[in-house]
Every structure is written in C-alpha cells, then in structure tokens.
Amino acid sequence: MVSGSKAGVSPHREIEVMRQSIDDHLAGLLPETDSQDIVSLAMREGVMAPGKRIRPLLMLLAARDLRYQGSMPTLLDLACAVELTHTASLMLDDMPCMDNAELRRGQPTTHKKFGESVAILASVGLLSKAFGLIAATGDLPGERRAQAVNELSTAVGVQGLVLGQFRDLNDAALDRTPDAILSTNHLKTGILFSAMLQIVAIASASSPSTRETLHAFALDFGQAFQLLDDLRDDHPETGKDRNKDAGKSTLVNRLGADAARQKLREHIDSADKHLTFACPQGGAIRQFMHLWFGHHLADWSPVMKIA
C-alpha cells in the first residue's frame, strides 16, 4: 500500500526518496553483468543514466491519490515497466536514421557508445522486459494485467509512439498548423503519460469516469511537458544536444516563446481542473505538477533537483 505524505518532510525531499526507490528497483531489474554481454550492459547503462524519472514518479503519486491498495513492489514493477519503455523509445529516437543525437541524459547516446546494432537490440530488450514485468505482476488479477499490457502496447504501437516519431521525422520541416503540431506532440509524449496513468488506475480499480478524467489530464500534461521541452531546446542543462529543433515547426518556433509559455500555462490550468475531478481527495500529483512547472517557467532554474 502506498502511504500518504509524511508530516514535516518537504515535497522536494519526498520526491528524492521516491526517485531513489525507483532507481533502486530499476537497478535490481537490470543487474550488473559481464562486460562481454554488451546488449545487457547497454540496456543497464541506458536506463541507469541520470534521468528525471517523471513517468514512474507520476505513477507513484497517482497511486497515492487513487488510494491504491496493492503492494509497493507491484507498483514499482508497473512504474519501472513504463520507464523501461520510455528509455527504449529514447534509444531509437537518438539513432542516426532518426534524430541523430549524440548526447542523452548528460552522457553519449547508446548508439554512440555501443554502436547502432547494439542500440537497436537493447531497445528491443527493454521493451520485452517492460511487457514481461506487467504480465508477471502477481498482485493483479489476470484481467487487469491484460488491460495494463494492452494500454502500454497501444501507446507504443503504430497509433502511438511509432506514429508520433514517424510524423516528427517526416512532417516537422513542413509548415504545419498548430493543431497538427499538437497532434504529433500527443503521440510523441502525451500518449505514454495517458497509458501510465491508466495502468495505475487499472491497478487501483478506479471507476471508468475517473479513468476518463485522468486521460484528459494526461492530454494537457503531455502538451505542457512537450512545450517545456521545446522551450528548453537551447538550454545548456538539459543533458541533450542543443538546438535540435532549429528548422522544425514546433509551437515555440511558430508562435514564439512568450506565446508558447502562455499556452503551456493554459494546459497546466486545464490539467489542474481535471485532477480536481479525478482525485478530489488527493493532491500529490497536483503539488508535483505545480512545483515542477513553476520552477522551470520562473527562470529555467536548475534549483529543483527533481528535474
């Protein structure tokens, strides 16, 4: 069972403790291996590189707000399955045939360090591990496990991350409308946020209306998250290649930074309203969301170390 917030513990400290529990669980899922097992080594290094862990953190916070009654190991398995999926998608996104990135999470990308073939195989290995984790979750009835697997597979597939990356590769240089950009942003970013919250809702036996409202929240949160990422494209502390959006039709490039920041705030306000209905008795996600975006929107300050 997920406990509530502890009295006297700052939100920042609590997030750090939760993130450490996620990192520890990930390390256990991908133990250190013989240096000759290059694919397993690439999987572990890709996952264990310093990351924000936003997705698994949100899952733990959502479990608190939704009054999840299962075990913490099961919840961590579900959360880490999503993080493995996210990391696999980053490995593929960074490939020379796609974004051709050299830096990720402050370190050389997987294909730069291990080669392209290893990066592809490592991403497949991570996806396999992710689905296996959910399928083997002992605390959940079989029907719920199947629903959770379906949520994640749909988010990853040809109507999810795959389509989003295809559009980003082929349409980003075009003069896209704002709606077209928003659609691609949802597929690239928002759809995995939606899937992970649905997985927590399934594990928490939440009502259909709650799940529907969480989906609406994820739509707005994902758009805000992508806008923040685009606004920080040239920021030196992202741990990624800088100015990768030059020449692309992002909302920031199309509307300007000030208008994009205003659009971001509108998405946060809308997401907050959805949370009021989805989690009326819990405020863990809401507090995290406002802390996270508030600090970054204020002055791009790196002071908030949950970044």
Curated annotation (Swiss-Prot):
Keywords: Carotenoid biosynthesis, Isoprene biosynthesis, Magnesium, Metal-binding, Transferase. Mg(2+) 1 binds at D93, D99. Isopentenyl diphosphate binds at K52, R55, H86, R105. Binds 2 Mg(2+) ions per subunit. It catalyses: isopentenyl diphosphate + (2E,6E)-farnesyl diphosphate = (2E,6E,10E)-geranylgeranyl diphosphate + diphosphate. GO terms for molecular function: geranylgeranyl diphosphate synthase activity; metal ion binding. Its EC number is 2.5.1.29. InterPro entries: Isoprenoid_synthase_dom_sf (IPR008949), Polyprenyl_synt (IPR000092), Polyprenyl_synt_CS (IPR033749). SUPFAM superfamilies: Terpenoid synthases. Pfam families: polyprenyl_synt. Its cofactor is Mg(2+). (2E,6E)-farnesyl diphosphate binds at R104, K188, T189, Q226. Catalyzes the condensation of farnesyl diphosphate (FPP) and isopentenyl diphosphate (IPP) to yield geranylgeranyl diphosphate (GGPP) needed for biosynthesis of carotenoids and diterpenes. This is Geranylgeranyl diphosphate synthase. It comes from Pseudescherichia vulneris. The gene is crtE.
